[in-house]
C-alpha cells in the first residue's frame, strides 16, 4: 500500500525526511492524515485538481479544459476520480474501464497490465484514465488515487505528459478524496452563482488551505459554471479573497454537448460556442503560465456564509 492513514494524535510515518516536521503538524485538529509514499509522486507535469459540488459540471469543465490545453500543444492526461467513472465520457465517447476494474481482473498484480488496458486516447490526443473507486461503504478513495499514480509511474506514462487534470468526486473533502491535492500545484473549484454551490466551495477552499500546510497545492480560484450572473460568487470573493477566474454561462448547448458525447470543441461553431471555447483557451493559458499568484483566501465559518448569502 502506498498511502498511509494516521490520526493526527499519532506520530506520523511515511513522509519524506525533508517534510517530516511539516507532516507531523497535520492538517488540523481531529484530521486523519492520508500520506503519500514519497516514491509515488508525479514528475515534472503541471497538475491541477478540479473540485466542486456534486452535479455542478466538473466533468464537463475538466474535459473541455483538457481539450483546451491540448489545443495549446500540451500533452494532457485526465484522471477521473469518481466511482461513476464518467469523467472522460465526452473525450472517449464511452465509459472506459477503471483502474480498479482492470486490477481486479489480474488479482491486483499490476505487473500483468499493459498501458492500453487502462489508459485510452480521447479527442485531440487527450489521454484518459478513470481511477474508479472502492465499492460503496468500503475502502478509501485516496488509496485508489495512490494506486493509480503508482501504476502510471510503473509504466512510465507520466514522463511524456505536460498537464495532469484530476476530476474529483463531488464536494467530498475527507482525507481520501483530498488525496489529489497532495499531487497538485493548483486546485480549482467549480461553482454556480447560488448559495448551495458557494457553500460547498467554501468548504472545499478550507480543505485546500489545510492541505497547503504540508503540500505544494494552492487554491487557483473559482470557475463560475452554469451561471448567467456571477454576483453571488463575486460577493463571496470580495469577502474571502477567493477570486473568480472564469465564467462559463448557462447555455443549453453545453448540456447538449454531453448528451451528444462531445466536447464543446467538437460542436458546431456558433457564436455562443466560439465564445465559450475562447474562455476555456484563455483559462488554460493562464493556468499554464501561472502569472497570477496563488490565492491566499480566508474561507468563512458556516454561520458567516449564511449571514453573507443566505438571507437576501
Curated annotation (Swiss-Prot):
List of residues binding [4Fe-4S] cluster: 140, 174
Cofactor: [4Fe-4S] cluster
Keyword Metal-binding on entry: yes
Entry superkingdom: Bacteria
InterPro entries with a match to the protein in the record: NifH/chlL_CS, NifH/frxC, P-loop_NTPase, Protochlorophyllide_ATP-bd
GO molecular function annotations of the record: 4 iron, 4 sulfur cluster binding; ATP binding; metal ion binding; oxidoreductase activity, acting on iron-sulfur proteins as donors; oxidoreductase activity, acting on the CH-CH group of donors, iron-sulfur protein as acceptor
UniProt EC number: 1.3.7.7
Cofactor note: Binds 1 [4Fe-4S] cluster per dimer.
Binding site for Mg(2+): 59
Catalysed reaction, written as an equation: chlorophyllide a + oxidized 2[4Fe-4S]-[ferredoxin] + 2 ADP + 2 phosphate = protochlorophyllide a + reduced 2[4Fe-4S]-[ferredoxin] + 2 ATP + 2 H2O
Known pathway: Porphyrin-containing compound metabolism; bacteriochlorophyll biosynthesis (light-independent)
Binding site for ATP: 55-60, 84, 225-226, 249-251
GO biological process: light-independent bacteriochlorophyll biosynthetic process; photosynthesis, dark reaction
Pfam families to which the protein is assigned, alphabetical: Fer4_NifH (PF00142)
Keywords: 4Fe-4S, ATP-binding, Bacteriochlorophyll biosynthesis, Chlorophyll biosynthesis, Iron, Iron-sulfur, Magnesium, Metal-binding, Nucleotide-binding, Oxidoreductase, Photosynthesis
Role summary: Component of the dark-operative protochlorophyllide reductase (DPOR) that uses Mg-ATP and reduced ferredoxin to reduce ring D of protochlorophyllide (Pchlide) to form chlorophyllide a (Chlide). This reaction is light-independent. The L component serves as a unique electron donor to the NB-component of the complex, and binds Mg-ATP.
Subunit structure: Homodimer. Protochlorophyllide reductase is composed of three subunits; BchL, BchN and BchB.
Family per similarity comment: Belongs to the NifH/BchL/ChlL family.
Protein name as annotated: Light-independent protochlorophyllide reductase iron-sulfur ATP-binding protein
Source organism: Rhodopseudomonas palustris (strain BisB5)
Gene: bchL
